[in-house]
Amino acid sequence: TTIRRYVETDTGHRVPNHKSKCRHLHGHRYRFEAEIEGDVVTVSGVSDEGMLMDFSDISRVLMEHVHDVIDHAFVVYEGDEEARRACELMGDEHRTVVVPFIPTAENLAKWAFEAVAPHISSTYGNKLRLVAMHCRETPKSIATWRPKLT
């Protein structure tokens, strides 16, 4: 069984070497959707009985480790000197998040997966795991990151 829960952020970025308008500073209403797999809790009388995990617990993790980090912030690649200088001109009050990758939807999906995965825990032994993170950049554009199973 799988369940999904999402958070949305208003976040700026740019793709510095892009052939089109994405190379300019701009923003999106991102949706980060966690997909969790596991067994339904069968322990009688517990709060999560009949669930994989309480949706509010997933929301708390997504809010803390994704939303609160990049909402109303500008995500900039550490190698994008122009964008970093532009952000620095706005001073310390500007929310800038410097990352070691170009902030495409694909890379942000992986970043969010890695931020959230350690915090998905199985309280009742139902072996929960984050199987995918979906990053919707626009209503028509969604990237998904899944770890390779070995």
Q: Language-model segments: what does each one mean?
A:
Residues 1-150:
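Charge-rich, low-complexity N-terminal segments
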